Amino acid sequence: MNRLLVGIMLLATMCIAGSCTDEDEYTQGQWMKKASYNGVYRAYASSFTIGDYGYLCGGFYGANKDYLNDLWEYDMSRNSWTQCADMPVAGRKAAVGFAVNGKGYITTGSVKDGSSSYCVADTWEYDPATDAWTRKDDFKGGVRDGALAFSIGGYGYVGTGCNSDATGSESAYKMDFYRFNPNGAEGSQWEAVSGYGGEKRYFGTAFVIDEVAYICCGRNNSTDLVDFWKFDGSNWTQLRDIANTDSDNDYDDDYAITRSEAVSFVIGGRGFVATGIRNSTSLSSDYWLYDPDKDLWYGDSDDDFTPITDVHNYPSGASSRRAAVGFSTGERGFVLTGTSGTSYFDDVYELLPDEEEEV
């Protein structure tokens, strides 16, 4: 597969009112093309990060929605890929991944049975030291896909999502959360986490800064969600909405953060949300930066993720995408794969943001 090397300059000059003043400005950043893996281009994959290694797992590709169960390891220091052991089960899409104590975990998602698909709840542990998978307790919240996941304090957390097979009084869209203890005894590795007061959401996203998880985006049916939450392992706190809905006009400018199927990652103590789809119809190519010290977002619709790349069944220059995944070390952030219409991607980009400066 052809891979074109390109860096893209991005404009990031929006200033947001409130505690942000006209003196604060985030300057240009750059997307840098990295090596692509030697596997099938895809969307709705899962990912997790262990140290300086990112892992890409599963997803699907093509008009027939061929579900994948392969695993790829990206060495960030060497910009190289290695194929690892496949998951020992059928391929899946829209699962979630997280890492705890040097091991990666994949759970939930959707698998294919002939021409139809159904949601699952099985959980699998990957040990990079042995390149082997081990089955763990099934996710206690039940089957679903499009959930979100993160890890803090030596535990993994999974919540929200949708069970498209729900019947009767059961709600398809979920707002529950569960904690995974990798050292727990068999049969007791998952426990419910209470206190989340946010919306039911499908294809939301989460990022972690200093052992605090931040949850945003996603949709409920076709409505994009504006609520924004943080969780420190014990307490949930609602933050300002990610849309200009505040009656006190905290946000002077139009916010365009709301979306689902987005990618998030952390660089230097700031969270980033990129790509995705708005109102279930309009693909996004922009990215936004969140400063937890100010509880403010920076960016605008001109801050595009606009890599020029070889895409499949689509004209070159396409950039907007949904259902991509990300890697995050806390100091480096990557966006890879995804889909745009009938196109699927295998490209990998790293964001190199410039620092905030006083002007």
PLM feature spans:
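Sec-dependent bacterial lipoprotein signal peptides
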Residues: 1-19
